[in-house]
Amino acid sequence: GVSVSQVPKAVKAFQEIAEKYRVTIATYGHASDGNLHTKMVIDPLDKDEWDRGVQAVNEIFDVCIELGGTVTGEHGVGLSKAPNFMKERQSEISSIKAIKAAMDPENILNPGKLEQWTGPFLRDLRYPCPEYMGHSPAVKE
């Protein structure tokens, strides 16, 4: 999310990123409070398209941060946002880990997620992606 005054700049930047990487990106959300959501339409089995999508997502998060916003302003972080959240909040990660350890010493609440995340996040997604499919014939070269 970004501040309301930055929404037009963010949406324009997202459109430019979509064109740059030749991907379809839908932007929607709660513009009145700066919460923007982007959804990309890609074939996760097409390695080239997947790679372009990953680059586009990283640039979208960079734009949000550059405009004074955040990579996650409304919902939980989730696995797909984890790398960019970690980059944005580097100075806070040790505190997050300490709070998690103090509140959940047996690690039964959402184990292996953000506070323990070491990447790459792609291995834990619920849909296939080229990096973790090896040389499957389903991957389009």
Located regions from the model:
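Conserved glycine-rich FAD pyrophosphate-binding loop
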Residues: G1-E141
